[in-house]
Amino acid sequence: MLDRDGYRPNVGIILTNAKNEVFWGKRVREHSWQFPQGGIKPGESPEAAMYRELLEEVGLLPQHVKILGRTRDWLRYEVPTNWVRREWRGSYKGQKQIWFLLRLVGRDSDVCLRATNHPEFDGWRWNDYWAPVDAVIEFKRDVYERALSELARFMRGVESHHAYLARTSTQSEQ
């Protein structure tokens, strides 16, 4: 389902742990990593879609997480034409997303990447809060930075993106 501008309604999930690290999933049979995300079905609320995607992609139930916040508005990214299915070219531009910030209140062992017959991820790890901005595929970077920046206000002890960049560039120079 596309909106009139050619964007597919979607939810993005930033799952955090008690150390303010974020869940980072490795796509099945690929070398790319990303946050869990997925489409919103007709008649489904963004929150309901988030819980469905969380179960499908990460194997977590609502009792395993606490919602800390969500983005106020849709965040959009365009998908390069060579990434778009041939039958969608001309009508599909990209994704528009509502992002949710969650805290894992369960255990790491509650994560189950094989909760469905069609897993999205075949590996996962915890990452520094800002690390995904530089690690995700280029066309998603702006949305990742905007989502993490907007939702950082719900986190205690998370440094600014600028401070993170300064710290990590200093560490890499040593």
Swiss-Prot record:
Role of this protein: Accelerates the degradation of transcripts by removing pyrophosphate from the 5'-end of triphosphorylated RNA, leading to a more labile monophosphorylated state that can stimulate subsequent ribonuclease cleavage.
Cofactors that this protein relies on: a divalent metal cation
Protein name per UniProt: RNA pyrophosphohydrolase
EC number: 3.6.1.-
Annotated source species: Chromobacterium violaceum (strain ATCC 12472 / DSM 30191 / JCM 1249 / CCUG 213 / NBRC 12614 / NCIMB 9131 / NCTC 9757 / MK)
Boundaries of every Nudix hydrolase domain copy: 6-149
Domain of life: Bacteria
InterPro entries reported for this sequence: Nudix_hydrolase, NUDIX_hydrolase-like_dom_sf, NUDIX_hydrolase_CS, NUDIX_hydrolase_dom, RppH
Record keywords, A-Z: Hydrolase
Broad EC category: hydrolase
Record Gene3D superfamilies: Nucleoside Triphosphate Pyrophosphohydrolase
Record Pfam families: NUDIX
